[in-house]
Swiss-Prot record:
The lineage of its organism: Eukaryota, Viridiplantae, Streptophyta, Embryophyta, Tracheophyta. The PPC domain mediates interactions between AHL proteins. PANTHER family: AT-HOOK MOTIF NUCLEAR-LOCALIZED PROTEIN 15, AT-HOOK MOTIF NUCLEAR-LOCALIZED PROTEIN 19. CDD domains: DUF296. GO terms for biological process: defense response to fungus; innate immune response; negative regulation of innate immune response. Residues 245-276 have a biased composition (Gly residues). Overexpression of AHL19 results in a decreased flg22-induced expression of FRK1. Overexpression of AHL19 results in an increased resistance to Verticillium wilt. This is AT-hook motif nuclear-localized protein 19. GO terms for molecular function: minor groove of adenine-thymine-rich DNA binding. The gene is AHL19. Slightly expressed in roots. Transcription factor that specifically binds AT-rich DNA sequences related to the nuclear matrix attachment regions (MARs). Negatively regulates plant innate immunity (PTI) to pathogens through the down-regulation of the PAMP-triggered FRK1 expression. Positively regulates defense against fungal Verticillium infection. PROSITE patterns: PPC.
Length: 315
């Protein structure tokens, strides 16, 4: 049998031939290494990925460009400003206010101790004059001696209404009640004085308005309140008088001038001779007197003011 054609030596260019007796066949060498093949595959994969990313970026750019462009028939809602207070702009807490000076019209409370052997009335009058404040005695306790009281007498009242009898008491007496007021003069009649009730050694109780000195036989404790710028009112107010005062009209005028010190109230009746003239001013500063019109001086609005000059504070 003839040899097959593949067993013979075939001369092929670029291929190495082996002898017929070799049992192995060599693969053709294409001069391509594995590293080169892997690099080419990786480069191809990376190239395809970059192309895909570029395409995605182009698509996003197109979409974003389409969003900014208004479409036909679309209604754009206007941007609303945020309402309310911006964050962090709340009112800061205000610093505390410290009042370093009391109002001159403030009512002050006092606990007064009067030493033994001292005249209670003279001590209170001196305190009111030096501090330029009115004193209202609310209560008191202690022991006094040799008291002179004014009491209403039945015979005196029958003979002349308003009459009173003076009673002089000798010895020591315990204070049951003590009330009254003191103004740093000048003051209207009846606005200054003390009313006292006493208990004797044998249990008798007497009382009345204090006349003359009131000597303390031991420490006397008083509860009092002081005030300033008192206003005197005449009650009841009549309708016509109230209307005139409300309208600012009046016939009389107040003459400012004397401030402090003693003396009678200063008033002028230059306007007219009727009884409803401007009420007198007691120790009132000139800047508190209202200016009058062309017909006369200023007039207080139906009130009698006791605006005493402010003295140096005791603390």
């Amino acid at each position: 049998m003839a040899n097959p054609w593949w067993t013979g030596q075939v001369n092929l260019s670029g291929l190495e031939t082996t002898p017929p007796g070799s049992s192995q066949l060599k693969k053709p060498d294409l001069h391509i290494s594995m590293n080169m093949a892997m690099d080419s595959g990786h480069n191809n994969h990376h190239h395809h990925q970059e192309v895909d990313n570029n395409n995605n970026d182009d698509d996003r750019d197109n979409l974003s460009g389409d969003d900014h462009e208004p479409r036909e028939g679309a209604v754009e809602a206007p941007t609303r400003r945020p309402r309310g207070r911006p964050a962090g702009s709340k009112n800061k807490p205000k610093p505390p206010i410290f009042v370093t000076r009391d109002s001159p019209n403030a009512l002050k409370s006092h606990v007064m101790e009067i030493a033994s052997g001292t005249d209670v009335i003279e001590t209170l009058a001196t305190f009111a004059r030096r501090r330029q404040r009115g004193i209202c005695i609310l209560s008191g306790n202690g022991t006094v001696a040799n008291v002179t009281l004014r009491q209403p007498s039945t015979a005196a009242v029958a003979a002349a209404p308003g009459g009173a009898a003076v009673l002089a008491l000798q010895g020591r007496f315990e204070i049951l009640s003590l009330t009254g007021s003191f103004l740093p003069g000048p003051a209207p009649p009846g606005s200054t004085g003390l009313t006292i009730y006493l208990a004797g050694g044998q249990g008798q109780v007497v009382g009345g308005s204090v006349v003359g000195p009131l000597m303390a036989a031991g420490p006397v404790m008083l509860i009092a309140a002081t005030f300033s710028n008192a206003t005197y009112e005449r009650l009841p107010l009549e309708e016509e008088e109230a209307a005139e005062r409300g309208g600012g009209g009046g016939s009389g005028g107040v003459v400012p001038g004397q401030l402090g010190g003693g003396g009678s109230p200063l008033s002028s009746g230059a306007g007219g001779g009727d009884g409803n003239q401007g009420l007198p001013v007691y120790n009132m500063p000139g800047n508190l007197v209202s200016n009058g019109g062309s017909g006369g001086g200023g007039q207080m609005s139906g009130q009698e003011a006791y605006g005493w000059a402010q003295a140096r504070s005791g603390f």
